[in-house]
Regions:
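Interdomain hinge/linker elements that couple catalytic modules in large macromolecular machines
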Residues: 16, 20-32, 196-305
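Pre-Walker A adenine-sensing motif
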Residues: 39-55
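Hydrophobic anchor at the beta1->P-loop junction of P-loop NTPases
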Residues: 63
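Conserved lysine of the Walker
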Residues: 71
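Hydrophobic positions on the alpha1 helix immediately C-terminal to the Walker A/P-loop
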Residues: 74, 78
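Short glycine-rich substrate-engagement loop in P-loop NTPases that contacts/grips substrate
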Residues: 93-126
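Short regulatory helix/loop adjacent to the ATP-binding pocket of P-loop NTPases
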Residues: 147, 164-180, 192-197
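Structural recognition of the conserved hydrophobic beta-strand(s) that form the central parallel beta-sheet
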Residues: 155-161, 182, 191
Length: 305
């Protein structure tokens, strides 16, 4: 795969990606295609596919969830696999030229013409999707969904972080033409897929269905894998760090960075509520500390006896 990045009109970056001799484009500040990041198998893919087959003519898809659970990644992965072409507009990084297009969406013919020209991507009626990534950062784009869906030429996927997407609706008319689905961190089975374990989940299902005991050796092995999942967690970035580095300390640092982002989001919403929002995290840390302290005391007492 060949990759090349070019500047067009000053601040607009177009990443040119050559795959098997074919030219692919993306832009708006998203550079994931130039990073060779892994894309994990997610169960929500089937929900998105159901929307495409049965609802996309009348509704845009809104994928909502906490930050860093993989919303943007799964949206783009789905667009690559299920559509002839796609445009991804990342409102966290996109250019002013793209933002200005939403000042006038009454003439949609001209709107789409300009969008294709600026992005360097051709759209095909009924076969292309436009992704509004981090749509909570630009509510005007979300409001435009009503008219874009009614136009019927293309499909639309929006992604938004839970906290901000609920807050940033004060000055807009929330479109009813949205089919909402929630995305969460990776569950145990998705974690197994990510680490290349295609056996354990089926084994557990078989044991439960047939009400059979696992046996000591199998039980120990399954519990070892489950404890690993509990240590790494379900955030894709943390799992990626574990797979690449095999270092739990680095995994913890990655998770700490994610929690820091959450804290920053809480402050943006309402600084005085930060303590309330963070209380569950603090309680977890207190309970974990007490549990570890009690275990150490009990073991010390047993040794003295």
């Amino acid at each position: 795969m060949g990759k090349k990045c070019e500047k067009i009109n000053g601040d607009l970056t177009v990443i040119l990606v050559y795959m098997n001799g074919d030219l692919r484009y993306t832009c708006g500040g998203k550079v994931d295609l130039c990073m060779d990041k892994p894309v994990f198998k997610r169960k929500i893919y089937d929900e998105i596919y159901e929307w495409k087959e049965n609802r996309s003519d009348k509704y845009a898809l809104l994928i909502k969830g906490a930050r860093r659970v993989g919303k943007s990644t799964i949206a783009e992965e789905f667009a690559k696999k299920e559509f002839k072409s796609y445009i991804l507009i990342d409102f966290a990084h996109t250019s002013k030229a793209i933002i200005d297009l939403f000042d006038d969406t009454y003439d949609l013919d001209f709107f789409f013409l300009q969008l294709q020209q600026l992005m360097g991507i051709r759209l095909y009626e009924k076969e292309s999707v436009i992704i509004f990534d981090e749509v909570q950062l630009f509510p005007k784009a979300r409001q435009a969904i009503k008219y874009l869906v009614a136009d019927g030429r293309y499909k639309y996927i929006e992604t938004g972080s839970l906290l901000s997407i609920k807050k940033n609706t004060k000055d807009i008319l929330i479109p009813s033409e949205e089919h909402k689905i929630s995305m969460f961190p990776m569950d145990f089975e998705e974690f197994l897929w990510a680490i290349g374990d295609e056996v354990s989940a089926e084994t557990i299902r078989h044991l439960i269905k047939n009400k059979k005991p696992a046996g000591n050796a199998m039980h120990r092995n399954l519990m070892r894998i489950f404890r690993l999942y509990m240590l790494v967690g379900g955030m894709p970035q943390a799992i990626e760090t574990y797979i690449e580095k095999n270092n739990l300390q680095l995994v913890d640092e990655t998770k700490r960075e994610i929690v820091d982002l959450y804290e920053e989001d809480f402050v943006k919403i309402e600084p005085v509520l930060l303590e309330i929002f963070m209380m569950p995290y603090l309680l977890i840390l207190v309970v974990m500390h007490q549990d570890i302290f009690c275990q150490v005391q009990e073991r010390g007492f047993a040794l003295r006896r």
